[in-house]
Amino acid sequence: MSLRRMLLPLALTQFVASFAGSSMNVSITDISHDIGTTVHGVQTAITLFLLCMAALMIPGSKLTDKLGRKWCLIVGLSVYGTGAVVAALAPVLGVLIVGYSVLEGVGSALMIPPIYILATMLFDNVESRARAFGVISGMAGIGAAAGPLIGGLITTAISWRVTFLLQAAIVGLVILLSRRIVDPAPADRSRHFDVVGAVLSAAGMFFVVVAILQIGVNGLLVAVFFVLAAALLFWFFLHIRSLERKKVEPLLARSLFRNRTSNLAMVTQNIQWLLMMGSSFVISVYLQVVRGYSAIQTGLTFTAATAGILVSSLAAERLAKRRAQSTLIRAGFVITLAGIGLGLALGNNTSSVWYLIPGLFFIGVGVGTMITPSVNVVQSSFPEERQGEISGLSRSVSNLGSSMGTAIAGTILIAAEARAHPYAIAMSSLALFGLIGLAAAMFLPANPVGRRR
C-alpha cells in the first residue's frame, strides 16, 4: 500500500473526530425535544464526551506501544462507530450518553494518537511529513469548521440522528481502508503499562477540563477542581519519578518535559486551538443572537474560515520546503491576529455580515498555516520509541486548548454583557492569547525539526 493511500484513512479518522466535536452544537435543541430532555441535558452529554476523550488520551496513546498502532486505530474506530450507531438510535438521554459520550469518547482516545504516530513514522523527512500533517491538520480544521454547517443542514433537512449515521458510515469505510496499513514498528506486548500512572493522569486531566468548563459558572468549583487537578497531577509526577528511579517504564517519561523546543511548540498548539474554538464560539453567538441567524446561515458564514484552512493546509508541503517550521508558526499567528483585527474593524452591529468574511478567511488561513508545523515540531522532537508518549501528550494539550477557547470566550461574553460591544471585548481578549502564542513561537529555534532527545 502506497504512503499516499495510507494517509487517506488517517486523515478521514481525524475529520470524523473533529466533526463530532462541533456538529452537535447546532442540533442541541432538536435532540433535546426528540429524546425528551432539556438543552442542559444535551450539553451535559457533550461535556462528558470532552471529559472522556481528554482523560483517556494519554493512556490510550501509551497503549499503542504495547498493542500496536494499527490495532489501536482499528479497535478505536470500531468502538467509535458502535457509539455512533447507539447514539443515532438513542430513545432517551441515558442511551445518548452511553453512545456519544462514553463509546465515542473512548474510541477517540484510542484512534486519534495512532494518526500522528503513524504519520511521523511513515513519513520520515520534513517535506513529506509536512504534507502528511498538512492533510491531517487540514481535515481536523475542516471537520471542526464545517461541522456546524453539515450538522445544521442534515438536522434541518432530515434528522440529527443522520449525523451520527454519517459518522458510522465514514468509520466503516476507514476501517476497510485501514486494514492495509503497514505498522512500521511491531507491537511489544512485553512492555510495561503503568496502570497507576494512567489512573492518576486520567483523573488529573478530568478535573482540569471540569474546572475549565466551570469557568463563569461557579468560581468556587473552579478553584476546587483546579486544586484537585494540581494535586493529582503532582502525585502523577511523583509516581513517574519513583518508577524511573526503579528502572520501570512510566506512562510518560520526565524527559518529555525537558525538551524546550517541544514544550514551546505545545504552547503554540494549545493557543492555536484556543483561538480557533474561541473565535468560532464568539462569532457563532454574535451571528445567532445579535443578527438572528439560523444554524444553517451561521454555518454558511463559516465556510470562509473553512476555505482558509483548506488553502493553507494544501500548501503545507510547499511552505515547508521554502520556510522553516518556526517561521510558519510565527506567520500563522500574525495572519490569525490580522483576521481578528479585520473582524473587529469591519464587523460592527450595523455593517453587512459580508464584512466578517475577510476576517474569517484570514483566521482560517492563519490557523491552517501554523497547525501543521506545530504538530511537526512536536512529533519530530522525539525518536520513534517515544512517539506513543508524545502523541498522547500533544493531543491532550490541543484538546485542552479547544475546551479553554470555548470556556474563556463564553466567560468573557457573560462578564462583558452589561457593557457596550461585548463581542468586541471577547475577540480582543482572544487576540491577547494570540500575542502570547506569538511570543512563545518567537523563542522557537530557527530549524526546530530534527532536534531529537
Regions found by a protein language model. Name each.
Residues 156-269, 275, 293-294, 300-301, ...:
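Hydrophobic transmembrane-helix bundles of small-molecule transporters
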Residues 47-61, 112-116, 303-315:
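Central cavity-lining transmembrane alpha-helices of secondary-active solute carriers
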Residues 27-56, 95-97, 296, 300:
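Extracellular/periplasmic helix-loop-helix junction of adjacent transmembrane segments
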